[in-house]
């Protein structure tokens, strides 16, 4: 489902076709998804 098509916490997020999973956000200067 849509929930699985996302980047888990700790994944690189810049230049990816997916967005960070729910309750995470892309920290651009660290280039990774972090929990919010």
Swiss-Prot record:
Keyword Transcription regulation part of the UniProt annotation: no
Localization (cell): Secreted
Pfam families associated with the record: Toxin_30
InterPro entries: Assassin_bug_toxin-like (IPR012325)
GO MF entries: calcium channel inhibitor activity; toxin activity
GO CC terms, sorted: extracellular region
Cysteine pairings via disulfide bonds: 6-21, 13-26, 20-33
Entries under SUPFAM superfamilies matching the protein: omega toxin-like
Keywords tagged on the record: Calcium channel impairing toxin, Disulfide bond, Ion channel impairing toxin, Knottin, Neurotoxin, Secreted, Toxin, Voltage-gated calcium channel impairing toxin
Predominant location: secreted
Family: Belongs to the venom Ptu1-like knottin family.
Annotated function: Binds reversibly and blocks N-type voltage-gated calcium channels (Cav).
Comment text on domains: The presence of a 'disulfide through disulfide knot' structurally defines this protein as a knottin.
Protein name: Toxin Iob1
């Amino acid at each position: 489902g849509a929930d699985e098509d996302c980047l888990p916490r700790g994944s690189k997020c810049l230049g990816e076709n997916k967005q960070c999973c729910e309750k995470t956000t892309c920290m651009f200067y660290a280039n990774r998804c972090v929990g919010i």
